[in-house]
C-alpha cells in the first residue's frame, strides 16, 4: 500500500476475479482486481475504501470501492474501455477529492474523540466509527445522554484545535513504545510488531491508526455535530 505518500502509481495486474472465478482477462462488466502495489486505501478501521480509476493508453477501468482482506487489496471495478489481462501494466489513480474529504473526516474523528474524553470523562472509549467523504459517525461508551451544552463545548474545542493549524506527526514504532507516548488503542485490536502513531495538534490527540489523515489540522476547516443518539 503506497497511499500514505502517493495518489497514483504505475502498477501491474496480479489477479482478476469475475463472477467468483479467477480469470486471466476481462473485457467487460464488473470484476475484482488485485494489483502488485496500490495507492487505494482498503476499507478498514471505520474508514471507507478509495475509489478512482485504472488506466493505460487502451484501457479505462472504474474503481468504485476498495476492500482489504488480510494483506490483499481488492479493487471493485467496472471495465469502461479495453481488455484487462493478468501481468498488464496500468496506472492506478485514486479520486483525490473524495480521498481528501474522507481524510479530513477521519482526522476530525480523532479530535472529537479527545474532546469527548476531555468534556465527558476519561471513561469514554471509541466503540466503532464510520468515516466517509460525506460525514463521520462515532460510536462511544458513555453512561448518559450528552447535553446540548456539552455538545457545544465539544464543537468549540474541536474547532479551536482545527484553527490552531498544527502539523500532524506520524510515528512508526513498537506497540510498547507507543504506550509510552500515551497513544490510545481501543477496539481490543491485536497489533503487530510495528504500529503507526498519529499525533494531531501536538499531544492533543495521540492514537494508533492505520487510516489516512490531514497533514495540518487547518485542512479540516470546520466541525459540526449534527445529531447524537444512543444505540
Descriptions of predicted regions:
Residues 1-231:
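A glycine- and charged-residue-rich anion-binding loop/surface
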